């Protein structure tokens, strides 16, 4: 219906009114026969496909009486009748096909059957004619009603009218009515109908308005006896559902030959005639049902809009209250999805695969295939073979299975069919249609005449005219595509044949079936399975003729061989149904359908043939049921199985449902019906897929939960706030608490060691995983230790959902570890004691050997003896080094390595290591180079001794495996943080290299790369192992190696040092190593692990205290910062005030100077006027005396060289204007100088102010600021109070930056240097350093190139400020290159002098010639004075331009080449300084400051010459070199020839030599007087005594501590200056002796004596014991001379010894 709702017309009382029953999902509605308009039925046209189908073919049961005398004729007539019937049926079928294909308007198909029977009685007996006719009509009506089991309404009329047979074909419109229909005896449909999720579709049936007749459709049958022919007219009707079935049995018994008995009975056939979707509920409440229920249906059957269907089904389900229990599964399945998950037709594609189980020749194949492909199914087909299906299931999975058992050939193992005989049916009562027929009319014809009887084996029963021969497989080719075959009425004759006859018949039938099967295979190969699978008429006739001929021959043979029995009766022409050996039934090729029956059992004698074929269709086969069961057993509950069936019997449906089918589709298969069912199945499949996923998820969740619950470890889940949400069973077992006791509480209740909570919670809130140990108390108050791992679980937005905590009980493991640790500590203590004893025992004899070797070397020995002693000493030192390495690695492994952190000079430490290794490296002919990044600060905090050890081991390793080339060490600043520096140290060599496979073994103890290396180079293999451990423990760094075999190796260390701060110098104490800290923490935990317990309140208090403490610290820090800022502000204010005062003072000074200058100028002017007056007075006198003194004046002018005095006096008669201008110029120069000094002073003040503002570190180092004008630069020292800056004085202030480096200390801007070096690495390192000092550097590789460069610089008037050359550079050859430069300078000087002499001679000649030409004396005098002045200026200018440039030369040479003879030669060649290689940058900086700095020594004795602005030294003078300011402010150095030596300054090496000579001149006996040596070893006493005697000490010795105390008591008047005391002595050790001495001094108030401990122990504990016992210092054995000298300087008479000085220094370090 469209637009508006349809009103239901009340039921009419007219009994002739007919209506349509419309049902859906168990509810029945009725339509009236008279609608208001034809448009009301538009939903029929819109919702259904139109077509005509002969659903009801009414056949009259004509009882043919055959006489005994006319058996042959009857047989012939039967054959003829069969032929005629076949022809008529073929024609009717053809007509029906045409009607279906066309769009005609007729709905009635008439079929005429002419049965030419000569002896046919059409009217039956006279006494029962009316009854028989009525019965026949009723039978026909029943047949029609029962055979119409369609589920769709087929209409051809465009006017939407249905043809009603009850009105003799009148077209009646359909209206709505509610007739009085008796209550249906049927119960509601079984639950499986709703379980299948089938959609709602219409089922309609006509009914009688008054309810007097149980038939809803009538059939008019006309029997015409004309020329022995019967004409039957059948009228088709719509598909009608019948509740009551009528069974009509006609029996004709006549003693004369014809007896007709007609019986009409109305029976309730419960098990028959029920379509799978035809559901009729109790109709008593039909009148009371709501009308809007029917109107709400949107009539969208067959449409693809699944959303509307879904809404309709949801609406219907809400109103089906009466079938709520049955509809619930479907309702829950369909309503489980929300709006976004609704199933749409376009989205169902490719969601699942479909398996179509069907024989290739099935009539439904094309329809199903096309429909499934159109709906987007991934379709796979296979025959009905369980093995084939199972193979497919193993390969892939399917979600939908469609099983079509029609025309199937399946192995049957059941014994339900025991008879092999064909079943004959009466041809007169036979009919066929396209639907299932469940009413069967059976005629039992019993003839008493035995002579003319015909049994089932007679040829007449198998005549070609029989239309109901069931043959195997043939129907697969010629069946109708519209639906499966239907059951037809069957006539069964009772046979009394013997067993032998039955066996023969079975054999013959088997042969026939095999032959027919072969023919069908040949035909099926040439035909295709289309929607219309019908064969042509010629093919059908040929097949029928062949089959009939074979059957006739077989029957004739049987009749000849076997006589008929008296009980056999003659029959009219029949249709045979044959059961093959395989128990499968098929039909003849002449039929559109294949009526096929499979009775439940033939073994029941009481069951009539009518009941046998009345209940089951041809698709019901026990093998099909078994197949369905087997298929379902191999599937899961989520796969859907649909069965195609021909039956309308609910019992058969139940069989398939019970066998595992989800749904079924009855015949005939309509595209609309199939599409609806597939839509429902697709929904079900989709739901099943969701359910399958849900089930798998549920299973996985169940497994996961089971695993977590039964896990042996504790599993906890916390919410983001830290509250416990879940605990597994293991928690209760381990802790003894019930889970409910702790659920919802904070996790801190489970932690006993609450000190870990802040760090843990900070890690977790930072979204990181925390791993550690948690201590928990058991319910019985015992401690439990857990190894825990807690990780946050994040969502897609990286937000914390919850925390997952996993704990493992490690209590027993922890107890075992603690016991093992205690045992190991005991063992370590014992081994440490043994190691200490062994160290003393080993080092003592080694120290004796080395000491004696040193003493012997000081005696007069031969060359060979001296060589032998050197070998002994070197071997002893090597052995001592190995012993020290063994002790170090033992201490490292024991965790007792001492690491002392102190402030030290990094550059000095590296330089000391390099210098100590230089002689060994250079003795092998190798080059040792070092470079320290200028950015690295001088002062760092770290273990300097361990740095020394690491560098020594690395350099020693490189030296061992390098025979040629070089070894270099490079230190770079890798990174810098707020608190530390990261320095990268690279040690490179050009040795043998290391193979790749040996690199992993390189840093292991007692291992080397190859075994042959140990034999060739020696060594213990401990050096690199110790380096690795020291780098990790002492510097928290890393060490790595890169090597190329045969080309050398590079060892890289990353070391971390702390920054030096002023507070560190006061609070710097020896810090323990990270390993020791870890051990101390472990010991502390071991001591307190069983005694710490805090409650939850304590945890909160602890947190609050921490917060308060943090706030307090922050407040203090803020206060400190504020105080510091205030101090800085105060300092700045003071400094600014001081600057203002200085500026005012400078201004006052400038004003005074200017005032003084003005006064001087005024005085000079007055003097000048006076002088002019006096000059005018004496002009005449001068003119008279001029001629006489001319020669004297020329000589005097030549000597003075035109020099003018500062007061402007001119004794040579210069003009007054000239003198006045000269004075003005001098005044201007003085004023300019003062202004320039003022500007310079202001710039220095601004620079100092910026230094003060930007300084944050109190580290104070001198800084050189180059100044071209002032003779002295600013020198910043450590004093915080500023001083005046006037006249080059120094001030004390903070440095420019907190980073105090060697590069930041010096600035030599403008200096130009020439470096002559052959080694590329050395040139590169020096180039980097000099760039930091702002020096312009030029590099050359040999002496010849260096000489050319130097000469070019001289010629271009841009000489080098300094020259550095290597002694081993080619072309230098020791002193040859400096000597060559010196000679070249001498030649240049001589040439310059000659030029000057020539110029002077020329000037004298010019002057004499000019004097002679003067006319008068006055003019001569004036011109002479002018010429003299000009000549003086020229000579002055020429002398200033021609200078001798002598650059300072610095020579680099290896230490091993240093000797006095070479030094003297280099000095004579003009070398100013000699530096040993490798170069120490601090020494190089000192040399540069000596020759390039503003405070250089030779600058103090030189005068500035600013006449021409170039500032070069005049070569004519005899003064020394000077540093002068050029026009551009650069520094340049000139050096004069000093008496032939060419060096006017004291050289650097002379300073060193003088310092060493001064040290040697000091008397050692004056440093330390009387000394006491206490030792229990005679050899040690001899060695130490001899060393002390060599430095001039008076030595006393004793062998025990008691003797030492006695000796000290005896010498009370003459006390000792120092006591060298051994620690380990038998009777009284050194600690006791030292305490006794200190007690004695305190008791008698004696002066403190220096006590120096001599010990072979190197452990820190022993050293601390020495200081605690009152000792002042210690010396480790073996004792060296250098250490003795240092002790003498420190504690001698002239030393700065104080009480406990060594101990205090040790504490600070």
From Swiss-Prot:
PAS domain span: 700-771
EC identifiers of the protein: 2.7.13.3
Composition-biased stretches (Basic residues): 1204-1221
Domain Histidine kinase per the UniProt entry, residue ranges: 837-1059
GO terms, molecular function: ATP binding; phosphorelay sensor kinase activity
GO biological process, one term: regulation of protein kinase A signaling
UniProt cross-references to PANTHER family, sorted A to Z: HYBRID SIGNAL TRANSDUCTION HISTIDINE KINASE L, TWO-COMPONENT HISTIDINE KINASE
Protein name: Hybrid signal transduction histidine kinase L
Organism of this sequence: Dictyostelium discoideum
Gene it is expressed from: dhkL
């Amino acid at each position: 219906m469209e637009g508006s709702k349809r009103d239901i017309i009340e039921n009419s009382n007219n009994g002739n009114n007919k209506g349509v029953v419309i049902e859906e999902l168990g509810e029945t509605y009725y339509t009236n026969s008279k609608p208001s308009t034809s448009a009301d039925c538009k939903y029929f046209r819109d919702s259904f496909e139109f077509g005509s189908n002969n659903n009801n073919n009414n056949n009259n049961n004509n009882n043919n009486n055959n006489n005994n005398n006319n058996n042959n004729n009857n047989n012939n007539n039967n054959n003829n009748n069969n032929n005629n019937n076949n022809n008529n049926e073929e024609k009717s079928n053809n007509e029906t096909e045409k009607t279906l294909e066309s769009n005609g308007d007729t709905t009635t198909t008439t079929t005429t059957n002419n049965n030419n029977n000569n002896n046919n009685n059409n009217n039956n007996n006279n006494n029962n004619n009316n009854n028989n006719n009525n019965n026949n009509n009723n039978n026909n009506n029943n047949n029609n009603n029962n055979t119409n089991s369609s589920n769709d309404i087929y209409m051809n009329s465009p006017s939407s009218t249905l043809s009603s047979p009850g009105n003799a074909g009148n077209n009646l419109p359909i209206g709505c009515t509610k007739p009085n229909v008796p209550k249906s005896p049927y119960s509601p449909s079984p639950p499986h109908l709703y379980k299948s999720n089938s959609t709602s579709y219409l089922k309609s049936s006509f009914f009688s308005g008054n309810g007097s007749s149980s038939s809803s459709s009538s059939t008019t049958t006309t029997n015409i006896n004309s020329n022995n022919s019967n004409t039957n007219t059948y009228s088709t009707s719509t598909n009608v559902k019948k509740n009551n079935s009528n069974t009509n049995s006609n029996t004709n018994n006549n003693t004369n030959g014809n007896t007709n008995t007609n019986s009409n009975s109305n029976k309730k056939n419960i098990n028959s005639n029920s379509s799978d979707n035809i559901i009729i509920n109790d109709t008593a409440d039909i009148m009371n049902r709501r009308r809007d229920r029917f109107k709400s249906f949107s009539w969208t059957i067959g449409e693809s809009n699944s959303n509307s269907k879904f809404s309709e089904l949801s609406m219907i389900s809400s109103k089906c209250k009466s079938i709520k229990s049955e509809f619930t599964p479907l309702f829950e399945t369909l309503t489980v999805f929300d709006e976004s998950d609704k199933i749409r037709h376009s989205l169902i594609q490719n969601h699942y695969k479909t398996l179509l189980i069907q024989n290739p020749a099935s009539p439904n194949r094309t329809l199903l295939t096309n429909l499934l492909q159109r709906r987007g199914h991934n379709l796979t087909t296979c025959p009905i073979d369980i093995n084939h299906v199972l193979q497919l299931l193993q390969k892939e999975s399917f979600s939908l299975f469609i099983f079509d058992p029609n025309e199937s050939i399946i192995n049957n193992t059941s014994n339900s069919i025991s008879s092999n005989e064909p079943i004959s049916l009466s041809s007169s009562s036979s009919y066929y249609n396209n639907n299932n027929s469940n009413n069967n009319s059976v005629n039992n014809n019993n003839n008493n005449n035995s002579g003319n009887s015909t049994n089932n084996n007679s040829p007449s029963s198998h005549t070609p005219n029989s239309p109901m021969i069931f043959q195997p497989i043939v129907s697969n080719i010629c069946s109708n595509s519209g639906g499966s075959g239907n059951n037809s009425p069957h006539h069964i004759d009772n046979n009394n044949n013997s067993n032998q006859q039955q066996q023969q018949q079975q054999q013959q039938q088997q042969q026939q079936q095999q032959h027919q099967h072969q023919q069908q295979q040949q035909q099926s190969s040439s035909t295709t399975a289309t929607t219309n699978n019908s064969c042509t008429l010629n093919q059908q006739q040929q097949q029928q003729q062949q089959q009939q001929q074979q059957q006739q021959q077989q029957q004739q043979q049987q009749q000849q061989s076997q006589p008929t029995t008296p009980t056999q009766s003659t029959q009219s022409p029949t249709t045979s149904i044959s059961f093959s050996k395989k128990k499968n039934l098929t039909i003849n090729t002449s039929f559109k359908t294949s009526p096929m029956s499979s009775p439940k059992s033939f073994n029941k004698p009481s069951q009539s043939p009518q009941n046998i074929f009345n209940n089951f269709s041809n698709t019901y086969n026990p093998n099909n049921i078994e197949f369905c069961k087997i298929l379902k057993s191999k599937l899961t509950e989520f796969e859907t199985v649909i069965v195609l069936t021909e039956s309308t019997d609910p019992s058969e449906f139940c069989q398939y449902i019970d066998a595992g089918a989800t749904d079924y589709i009855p015949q005939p298969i309509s595209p609309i019906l199939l599409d609806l069912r597939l839509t429902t199945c697709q929904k079900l499949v989709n739901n099943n897929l969701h359910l399958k996923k849900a089930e798998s998820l549920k299973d996985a969740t169940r497994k996961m939960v089971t695993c977590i619950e039964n896990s042996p470890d504790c599993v906890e889940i916390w919410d983001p706030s830290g509250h416990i949400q879940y605990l597994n069973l293991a928690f209760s077992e381990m802790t003894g608490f019930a889970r409910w006791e702790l659920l919802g509480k904070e996790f801190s209740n489970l932690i006993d060691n609450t000190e870990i909570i802040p760090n843990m919670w900070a890690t977790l809130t930072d979204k990181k995983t925390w791993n550690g140990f948690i201590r928990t108390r058991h319910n019985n108050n015992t401690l439990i230790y857990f190894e825990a791992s807690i990780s946050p679980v994040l969502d897609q937005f990286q937000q914390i959902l919850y925390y997952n905590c996993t704990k493992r009980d490690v209590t027993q493991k922890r107890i075992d570890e603690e016991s093992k640790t205690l045992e190991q500590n005991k063992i370590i203590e014992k081994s440490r004691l043994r190691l200490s004893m062994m160290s003393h025992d080993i080092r003592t004899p080694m120290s004796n050997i080395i000491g004696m070797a040193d003493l012997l070397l000081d005696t007069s020995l031969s060359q060979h003896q001296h060589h032998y002693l050197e070998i002994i000493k070197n071997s002893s030192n090597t052995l001592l080094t190995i012993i020290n390495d063994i002790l170090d690695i033992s201490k490292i492994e024991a965790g007792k390595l001492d690491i002392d952190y102190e402030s030290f000079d990094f550059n000095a430490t590296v330089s000391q290591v390099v210098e100590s290794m230089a002689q060994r490296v250079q003795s092998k002919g190798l080059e040792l180079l070092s470079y320290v990044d200028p950015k690295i600060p001088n002062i760092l905090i770290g273990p300097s001794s361990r740095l020394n050890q690491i560098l020594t081991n690395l350099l020693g390793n490189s030296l061992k495996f390098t025979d040629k080339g070089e070894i270099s060490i490079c230190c770079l600043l890798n990174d810098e943080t707020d608190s530390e520096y990261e320095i990268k140290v690279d040690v490179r060599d050009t040795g043998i290299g290391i193979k790749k496979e040996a690199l992993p073994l390189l840093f292991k103890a007692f291992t080397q790369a190859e075994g042959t290396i140990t034999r060739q180079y020696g060594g213990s293999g401990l050096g690199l192992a110790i380096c690795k451990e020291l780098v990790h423990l002492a510097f928290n760094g890393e060490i790595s190696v890169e090597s190329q075999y045969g080309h050398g190796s590079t060892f890289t260390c990353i070391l971390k040092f702390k920054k030096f701060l002023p507070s560190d110098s006061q609070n710097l104490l020896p810090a323990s190593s990270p390993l020791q800290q870890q051990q101390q923490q472990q010991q502390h935990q071991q001591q307190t692990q069983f005694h710490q317990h805090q409650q939850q309140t304590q945890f909160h208090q602890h947190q609050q205290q921490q917060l308060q403490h943090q706030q307090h610290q922050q407040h203090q820090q803020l206060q400190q910062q504020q105080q510091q800022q205030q101090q800085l502000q105060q300092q700045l204010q003071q400094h600014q005030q001081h600057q203002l005062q200085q500026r005012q003072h400078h201004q006052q000074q400038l004003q005074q100077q200017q005032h003084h200058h003005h006064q001087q100028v005024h005085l000079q002017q007055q003097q000048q006027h006076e002088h002019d007056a006096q000059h005018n007075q004496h002009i005449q006198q001068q003119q008279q005396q001029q001629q006489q003194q001319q020669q004297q004046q020329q000589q005097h002018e030549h000597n003075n060289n035109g020099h003018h005095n500062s007061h402007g006096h001119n004794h040579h008669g210069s003009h007054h204007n000239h003198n006045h201008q000269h004075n003005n110029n001098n005044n201007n120069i003085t004023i300019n100088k003062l202004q320039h000094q003022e500007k310079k002073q202001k710039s220095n003040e601004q620079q100092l102010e910026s230094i003060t503002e930007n300084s944050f570190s109190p580290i104070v180092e001198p800084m050189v600021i180059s100044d071209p004008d002032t003779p002295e630069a600013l020198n910043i020292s450590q004093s915080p109070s500023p001083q005046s800056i006037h006249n080059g004085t120094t001030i004390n202030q903070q440095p420019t930056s907190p980073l105090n480096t060697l590069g930041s200390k010096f600035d030599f801007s403008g200096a130009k240097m020439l470096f002559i070096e052959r080694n590329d690495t050395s040139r590169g390192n020096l180039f980097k350093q000099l760039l930091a000092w702002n020096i312009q550097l030029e590099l050359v590789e040999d002496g010849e190139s260096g000489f050319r460069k130097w000469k070019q610089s001289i010629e271009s008037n841009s000489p080098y400020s300094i020259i550095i050359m290597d002694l081993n550079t080619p072309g230098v050859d020791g002193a040859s290159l400096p000597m060559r430069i010196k000679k070249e300078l001498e030649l240049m000087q001589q040439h310059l002098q000659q030029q000057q002499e020539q110029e002077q001679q020329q000037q004298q000649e010019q002057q004499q010639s000019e004097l002679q030409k003067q006319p008068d004396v006055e003019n001569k005098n004036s011109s002479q004075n002018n010429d003299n002045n000009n000549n003086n200026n020229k000579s002055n200018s020429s002398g200033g331009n021609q200078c001798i440039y002598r650059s300072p030369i610095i020579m680099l040479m290896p230490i091993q080449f240093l000797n006095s003879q070479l030094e003297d030669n280099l000095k004579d060649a003009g070398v100013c300084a000699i530096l040993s290689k490798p170069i120490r940058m601090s020494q190089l900086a000192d040399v540069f400051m000596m020759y390039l700095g503003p405070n250089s020594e030779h600058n103090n004795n030189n005068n500035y010459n600013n006449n021409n602005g170039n500032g070069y030294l005049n070569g004519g003078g005899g003064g020394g070199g000077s540093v002068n300011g050029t026009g551009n402010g650069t520094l340049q150095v000139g050096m004069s020839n000093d008496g032939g030596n060419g060096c006017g300054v004291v050289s650097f090496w002379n300073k060193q030599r003088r310092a060493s000579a001064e040290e040697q001149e000091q008397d050692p006996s004056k440093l330390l007087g009387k000394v006491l040596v206490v030792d229990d070893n005679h050899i040690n006493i001899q060695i130490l005594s001899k060393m002390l005697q060599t430095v001039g000490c008076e030595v006393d010795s004793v062998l025990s501590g008691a003797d030492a105390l006695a000796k000290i008591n005896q010498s009370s008047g003459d006390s000792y200056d120092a006591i060298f005391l051994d620690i380990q002595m038998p009777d009284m050790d050194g600690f006791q002796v030292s305490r006794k001495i200190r007690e004695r001094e305190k008791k008698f108030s004696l002066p403190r004596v220096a006590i120096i401990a001599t010990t072979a122990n190197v452990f820190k504990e022993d050293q601390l014991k020495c200081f605690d016992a009152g000792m002042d210092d210690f010396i480790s054995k073996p004792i060296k001379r250098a250490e003795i000298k240092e002790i003498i300087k420190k504690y001698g008479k002239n030393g700065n010894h104080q009480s406990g000085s060594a101990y205090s220094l040790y504490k600070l370090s």
